[in-house]
Amino acid sequence: MALPSLLLVVAALAGGVRPPGARNLTLAVVLPEHNLSYAWAWPRVGPAVALAVEALGRALPVDLRFVSSELDGACSEYLAPLRAVDLKLYHDPDLLLGPGCVYPAASVARFASHWHLPLLTAGAVASGFAAKNEHYRTLVRTGPSAPKLGEFVVTLHGHFNWTARAALLYLDARTDDRPHYFTIEGVFEALQGSNLSVQHQVYTREPGGPEQATHFIRANGRIVYICGPLEMLHEILLQAQRENLTNGDYVFFYLDVFGESLRAGPTRATGRPWQDNRTQEQAQALREAFQTVLVITYREPPNPEYQEFQNRLLIRAREDFGVELAPSLMNLIAGCFYDGILLYAQVLNETIQEGGTREDGLRIVEKMQGRRYHGVTGLVVMDKNNDRETDFVLWAMGDLESGDFQPAAHYSGAEKQIWWTGRPIPWVKGAPPLDNPPCAFDLDDPSCDKTPLSTLAIVALGTGITFIMFGVSSFLIFRKLMLEKELASMLWRIRWEELQFGNSDRYHKGAGSRLTLSLRGSSYGSLMTAHGKYQIFANTGHFKGNVVAIKHVNKKRIELTRQVLFELKHMRDVQFNHLTRFIGACIDPPNICIVTEYCPRGSLQDILENDSINLDWMFRYSLINDLVKGMAFLHNSIISSHGSLKSSNCVVDSRFVLKITDYGLASFRSTAEPDDSHALYAKKLWTAPELLSGNPLPTTGMQKADVYSFAIILQEIALRSGPFYLEGLDLSPKEIVQKVRNGQRPYFRPSIDRTQLNEELVLLMERCWAQDPTERPDFGQIKGFIRRFNKEGGTSILDNLLLRMEQYANNLEKLVEERTQAYLEEKRKAEALLYQILPHSVAEQLKRGETVQAEAFDSVTIYFSDIVGFTALSAESTPMQVVTLLNDLYTCFDAIIDNFDVYKVETIGDAYMVVSGLPGRNGQRHAPEIARMALALLDAVSSFRIRHRPHDQLRLRIGVHTGPVCAGVVGLKMPRYCLFGDTVNTASRMESNGQALKIHVSSTTKDALDELGCFQLELRGDVEMKGKGKMRTYWLLGERKGPPGLL
């Protein structure tokens, strides 16, 4: 059920009044009112609370109202708990919001825990809150916290292999809320918990402070963390520059979580924290020193919802609170409060649905643990302690010319992983410094003895170095000669005569791997090739007795330059299980082609588009794993990148191992399609936006483009709806490519059904097709990512292969069963159609393969009827109206004759022919059966209405005759069961010489009916019949309800 109608009252410390009798959801705020230097100040957070309340009002039937009063003492550890008690006594709130300052948060959190009252804050960053013991059981931190910063730092140390020591410097005035102390505390505890030697010192602003800092750094660590105002960092770096500590042996991490140093200020530009109002010499020294500085900040959410939220936040702050806020990372805290309120409402709703109440604070808080949901600040992940996982950014001087700081890495707290942007960190010595170099700190080590070497030792050392240099030179010369020999031998070359074509059944039945370009299942139909076909096939041949795949190159000749020779050598050298093996190339004009390993299962695109193949997620993850392994190897090889990765370039061998093909040999590649062809745009559906736009690429540009292509393939595998599936949109490949190329927010990407897919898989897709190539992970990171959430992927290679083969066998068995059922269904339909065309006995003879002989019948009764005035009626009606009329009439007739022992022979226009007494003989019952049927049809016609002429009466004329006939099947194409003999002609004359709405019968039929004595007949007289002369005929008037006769 939904929440009941609620009144949300924001009671700010004192003065709020709960309306009598109202069922209120009361939210109490304990935040500072005026000090905007706090990110959690009420003028910053208040607009976010108002926006959250409005969002709740749209989602739930809520009656909302604010009650506010003066806010003071919210960052005082003495006044804040008193205000909290007042709030509890006077307003009995359901949720406390704040405080953000650490010391008052500790006091208020203890009270809240005692009251079992949820306390939600996006501040209170201290590590002491991480252990939610009995003092802080109801504290929920939906914003960043110092322990999460520590986790990021530990991950950084692991990446750079810093395992020994670190030094921490921070400012701690002890007269404020100690923000620098509590921020660096998380780093200290995390590093200490990782068994590092961590020393820390408080920076003093008194004279000699910078010298004391550099002395502390020299003595305690090469990896230095500094937390304090930017002026403090400048002072330390200037002194470090003077003492040559910025020579690359040290690295300085500046903990500026809100990124204030990167924002533009009175004396500095955006992204230039080294700029300051100093002398030119000091400014140059600072700029050089900052090359050794890495800045750590929170990560601004990249999702469009956050940008929209921030814009609305600034407007509401100006209109409702009279303050001008600037776009900055401080607004992230307001967004965290917003997401926290919505999280509380969601969990409260669930609690009430489960039979709980708003007063059950502990239960509500416990349900928040481990939550994952998407808020305005992106993906919100709460850990088991109800602390939010936090994302960070590592900034470095990415442009040495301008000195601009740029993101070097992003850290995902939810994934515990660093995603490197591809921008290299400008290490002064080209590599990260060592955290514990030999003899830097442990001077007691005997190996650190710096006694000068003797003359004999120097001579021996020089001789040894000379021999080593001579050996290395000889080896390099030998290797150079062997390389030239290998290039000249052209081991890759295949003569056209060596390739065998023709009847492939002799070697390999079914050769011809289907490398489809069909886009069946997508929203824009099938891709047609230049030849008008819906798929293209991989050409195959035979080389040295083995089936090989042959890719023809649309070039007249290949110039064997040194570059081309090296490309071909590299293709032979690259060997890996998940890359198709390069066998060789033919350069004999006009038969220029590339010869590679043949994979008989076809392409990945074939498999995904084949609905008869059931792919469970174990199988899909196995294919994804193969693809990632292949691309990781390719990116680390001499070839470096693929450049044209798509599902049709991923093939599957006989053991269901996915292999990547069509890589390398850039000199052989060519585009045969015209620039505006449909096929060309369809191939570009996997192409990264930076390649489509044609902008210059960074060093790793093609590798990051491959990652984008991998994301599109990942979406294909996940949804099996074709590349770039767009739910509800019908766009051509050209339109899709143009939208991707434009690069406008929100970026145009395929549709994803988050409810059906693993959330981590969706996140991986989104990271891989990020607009900024630097934000995409590399395949090494992707491999680790997939290994984590593919729990079943740890089986052995043999087990994996057996599972794949078993699934393939199951698919085949299911396919055979489906095809059998389809065959039986089609057989049933064919037999039903045959029984409608021919009599059942005749159809059975044909099914048994027997010849149907013509058969004579001594006595049958034939019925003929047509519509009087049908020609005139047809002339006055449209063809569709005539068809509708006949269909309605004969549907009515067919339903009636099913009640009698008769057989419908045929209908020709408005003529209707029925017989009784054949093909199944029924003795003397044929005449009364036809008579009763004729009376029933005549009765039906009297009430029949013509749709387009409802006031007209349909006039049916009926003729009946009894006599001998011969019946048989005539013709091979569309065979018909026909009647022959004078009886047929006479019956037709009886109908044509009859009258409308009357049944005209012959004397023979009258004699047959008289034997029963229950039919009323009236003599018509002698009637002149064409070709028959005069015949005595009768009108059948009806059937008497007397005692039954023989029938």
Swiss-Prot record:
Phenotype upon changing S522A: Reduced phosphorylation, 30% loss of CNP-dependent activity
Domain Guanylate cyclase, first and last residues per copy: 861-991
Signal peptide range: 1-16
Subcellular localization(s) per the UniProt record: Cell membrane
Paired cysteines (S-S): C75-C101
Extracellular side: 17-458
The protein's enzyme class: lyase
Family: Belongs to the adenylyl cyclase class-4/guanylyl cyclase family.
Name of the protein in its database record: Atrial natriuretic peptide receptor 2
Originating organism: Rattus norvegicus
Gene (UniProt): Npr2
